[in-house]
Amino acid sequence: MSPQTETKASVGFKAGVKDYKLTYYTPQYQTKDTDILAAFRVTPQPGVPPEEAGAAVAAESSTGTWTTVWTDGLTSLDRYKGRCYHIEPVAGEENQFIAYVAYPLDLFEEGSVTNMFTSIVGNVFGFKALRALRLEDLRIPISYVKTFQGPPHGIQVERDKLNKYGRPLLGCTIKPKLGLSAKNYGRAVYECLRGGLDFTKDDENVNSQPFMRWRDRFLFCAEALFKAQAETGEIKGHYLNATAGTCEEMIKRAVFARELGVPIIMHDYLTGGFTANTSLAHYCRDNGLLLHIHRAMHAVIDRQKNHGMHFRVLAKALRLSGGDHVHSGTVVGKLEGEREITLGFVDLLRDDFVEKDRSRGIYFTQDWVSLPGVLPVASGGIHVWHMPALTEIFGDDSVLQFGGGTLGHPWGNAPGAVANRVALEACVQARNEGRDLAREGNEIIREASKWSPELAAACEVWKAIKFEFPAMD
């Protein structure tokens, strides 16, 4: 390097470490319509001011590093840096703050959830200045939303494909989740679909194991659903899990499902990864397959209240990446889910425009500009006594999925499916007649059980089942 070049590079450059807040804390900043906005729950280490912590998050998730570098002078930091533009304390929590960060859109590759998350929830979560960090919400600007395909088909197209309207859809996860042969698995699928369910489902960890290879499962399940369709006159589906060890193998399984003529396949989007999921969603749209999404591994990311990422962010990411269904919790079953918070991200999955509402955990107004919606799937420890509450909470545009609540029926799989279908039809009819499902739900189920022995037997088996545990965290 020549002396002249050295002199030029060193002009205005001072080596060393600067406080992040001098560059990245900008409370006067006016956010732009094109900015990606993030709300982080920040727990600073003792002695670290909240402004410095918020600025550190903005820096480490955008252009910053631990020291000043001379190459900063070769670009426009003001154009590309993230900015912490507001900080507020969290009510009732000691040393916790919500830090709002704005990111310029040019920081992100178009149509890539993978790239967006690599920046926003990447290395910054291991930053030593923070005791804990949680991403509570994201505002995805319209200009970025329009770079994504989103769900392969969406709610209305799915209803048209299935020719089913005016009620939630019914599903069942085949149990035991592991260990059945393909033929016995297909038998359970047939019995549940014949009994009145719309869908049956592979469990999330059913891929291609020694006891049941994927091709055998696909063949027996396809035979089962076509037989059930012929006998009931209704369109049926089974979520064939295409998740695999490589993207190439995943697409091979999706191709085989399409060749069989089945309507829907499935993917584990967190363990499989967003790149794989987006690729599969594109294939499904191009080839007329619905795509069911399981959220296995979500609690590793979202269960801690002060660290990780709230599921509403994962739900938004899924709507961008692509999926026609996604598991969303039940509010009433065996898995965690607070009612208002759950309904907040259910609206973010289904609705075209969602207003800011902090009481439901929605930190930003979100405009999806007609990106197709995603059906929330309520699944986990639910049975016929939960049907009125589920119908009232989730409404028509949902999938209610009863695994043990179908297959655990004392008379067998088909009667278990009948019991759930009768309970659902009774609840929908009662709601349409103006009855209050929240107040009269148990009575509605009892009335229906008088003319349905299958429902009466189910009511007796599960009358005392509750999943109520004191929260310890």
From Swiss-Prot:
UniProt modified residues of type N6,N6,N6-trimethyllysine: K14
InterPro entries according to UniProt: RuBisCO, RuBisCo_large_chain_AS, RuBisCO_lsu_C, RuBisCO_lsu_C_sf, RuBisCO_lsu_fd_N, RuBisCO_lsu_N_sf, RuBisCO_lsuI
Post-translational modification: The disulfide bond which can form in the large chain dimeric partners within the hexadecamer appears to be associated with oxidative stress and protein turnover.
Residue stretch(es) of the prosequence: 1-2
Pfam families in alphabetical order: RuBisCO_large, RuBisCO_large_N
Cofactor binding note from Swiss-Prot or TrEMBL: Binds 1 Mg(2+) ion per subunit.
Location of N6-carboxylysine modifications: K201
Residue(s) carrying N-acetylproline: P3
Swiss-Prot/TrEMBL cofactor(s): Mg(2+)
Location of the protein in the cell: Plastid, Chloroplast
GO biological process, one term: reductive pentose-phosphate cycle
Catalytic activity: 2 (2R)-3-phosphoglycerate + 2 H(+) = D-ribulose 1,5-bisphosphate + CO2 + H2O; D-ribulose 1,5-bisphosphate + O2 = 2-phosphoglycolate + (2R)-3-phosphoglycerate + 2 H(+)
A cellular component term, taken from the record's GO annotations: chloroplast
One Gene Ontology MF term: monooxygenase activity
Keyword flag Zinc-finger: no
Entry's family note: Belongs to the RuBisCO large chain family. Type I subfamily.
Note: The basic functional RuBisCO is composed of a large chain homodimer in a 'head-to-tail' conformation. In form I RuBisCO this homodimer is arranged in a barrel-like tetramer with the small subunits forming a tetrameric 'cap' on each end of the 'barrel'.
Protein's name in the database: Ribulose bisphosphate carboxylase large chain
Organism: Cajanus cajan (Pigeon pea)
